[in-house]
């Protein structure tokens, strides 16, 4: 019997030697507690959540792409949140209106009828059942819907508050407590009647004509939102960079010089200080160079014209003879034409 017992223990020990923990890659001894799951083995202390590295409460875990997670971390990482109750969704998910929903939470926004199994219709950004949608269409097609009472708003009788449309009578002025009209104004997340607003001294943007609540730009005799003070050509915000004014309009440096000054033909930047003018173009001093070898040229350097660009003598001499001949003939023809035009009488 002792011989048989020793033989069994030896087989078990040999079996443990061939097993390795999935997490720590260490082996097992006869005294180690072991967890076996899906044909893989762990030390009991290694069998933990892949996210928080804590043991699984009540031994419950969820597996995703070969990794095991506790219930909390699995929901945080992979479960969608309901668009109504903001709780994690386990089981059936309804995807609609650019959000996910519990089946019991996806309801008509007017009558609260569940829509998961009967379908819905989109109306002014709302999910409605067929009956409510028909009533809304009959009440007034294409009009705003009040975000508070969900009723249609007569044309021209809505106000915007935090991005949504409302009947103005749902609100009172923050300062005088009078019921608001369509002439109300929103400032720092609060609504004011027009009279109270005008006494607050808040600047109005010269572009969008709305109050400026944060940083303000003062230019051209007006006030502007930072993002609304833009070049009148490219419409890019100046964002604190230098701007140029002409006849009451703002311009960025590039478009101001393009319209009213000189831009370097090569680099495209406005020319400042000394410039080179040749071939009906303007260059910065540092940019006036051979169009082939990029050798810097100056007023004393002899250059040739090729394709309306400057070419140094060394590069020009490398041109084929036939090409140089055609260039010379073309320049002569152009000079003759220019001379003829200069001698022609102007229109009477």
From Swiss-Prot:
What the entry lists under Gene3D superfamilies is as follows: Cysteine Rich Protein
Pfam families membership: LIM (PF00412)
Positions the record marks as coiled coil are: none
One GO CC term on file = basal plasma membrane
Sorted UniProt keywords: Cell junction, LIM domain, Metal-binding, Nucleus, Repeat, Zinc
Grouped into one coarse class, the protein's main location is: other
Record GO terms (molecular function): metal ion binding; myosin binding
Give the UniProt record's GO annotations in the biological process aspect.
cell-cell adhesion; cell-cell junction organization; mitochondrion organization; muscle cell cellular homeostasis; muscle organ development; positive regulation of integrin-mediated signaling pathway; positive regulation of locomotion; positive regulation of sarcomere organization
Q: Which residues form the signal peptide?
A: none
As for what it does, the entry says:
Component of an integrin containing attachment complex, which is required for muscle development and maintenance. Probably function in adherens junction. Affects the structural integrity of the integrin containing muscle adherens junctions and contributes to the mechanosensory functions of touch neurons.
Assembly and partners? Interacts with unc-98. Component of an integrin containing attachment complex, composed of at least pat-2, pat-3, pat-4, pat-6, unc-52, unc-97 and unc-112.
Q: What is this protein called?
A: LIM domain-containing protein unc-97
* Organism from which the protein derives: Caenorhabditis elegans
């Amino acid at each position: 019997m002792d011989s048989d017992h020793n033989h069994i223990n030896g087989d078990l020990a040999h079996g443990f030697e061939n097993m390795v923990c999935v997490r720590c890659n260490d082996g097992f001894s006869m005294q180690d507690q072991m967890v076996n799951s899906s044909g893989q083995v762990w030390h009991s202390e290694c069998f933990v959540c892949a996210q928080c590295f804590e043991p699984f409460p009540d031994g419950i875990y969820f597996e995703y792409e070969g990794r095991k997670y506790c219930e909390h971390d699995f929901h945080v990482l992979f479960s969608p949140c309901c668009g109504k109750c903001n709780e994690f969704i386990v089981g059936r998910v309804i995807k609609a209106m650019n959000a996910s929903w519990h089946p019991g939470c996806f309801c008509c926004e007017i009558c609260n009828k569940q829509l998961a199994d009967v379908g819905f219709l989109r109306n002014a950004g709302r999910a409605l059942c067929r009956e409510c949608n028909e009533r809304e269409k009959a009440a007034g097609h294409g009009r705003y819907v009040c975000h508070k009472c969900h009723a249609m708003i007569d044309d021209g009788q809505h106000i915007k508050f935090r991005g949504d449309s409302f009947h103005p009578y749902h609100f009172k002025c923050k300062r005088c407590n009078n019921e608001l009209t369509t002439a109300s104004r929103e400032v720092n997340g609060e609504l004011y009647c027009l009279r109270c607003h005008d006494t607050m001294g808040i600047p109005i943007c010269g572009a969008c004509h709305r109050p400026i609540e944060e940083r303000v730009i003062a230019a051209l005799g007006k006030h502007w939102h930072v993002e609304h003070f833009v070049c009148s050509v490219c419409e890019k915000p100046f964002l604190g960079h230098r701007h140029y004014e002409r006849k009451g309009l703002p311009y960025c440096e590039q478009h101001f010089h393009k319209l009213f000054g000189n831009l370097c033909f090569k680099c495209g930047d406005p020319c400042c200080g000394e410039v080179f003018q040749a071939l009906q173009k303007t260059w910065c001093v540092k940019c006036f160079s051979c169009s082939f070898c990029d050798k810097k040229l100056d007023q004393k350097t002899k250059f040739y014209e090729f394709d309306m660009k400057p070419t140094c003598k060394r590069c020009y001499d490398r041109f084929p003879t036939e090409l140089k001949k055609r260039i010379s003939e073309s320049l002569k023809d152009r000079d003759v034409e220019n001379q003829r035009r200069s001698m022609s009488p102007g229109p009477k």
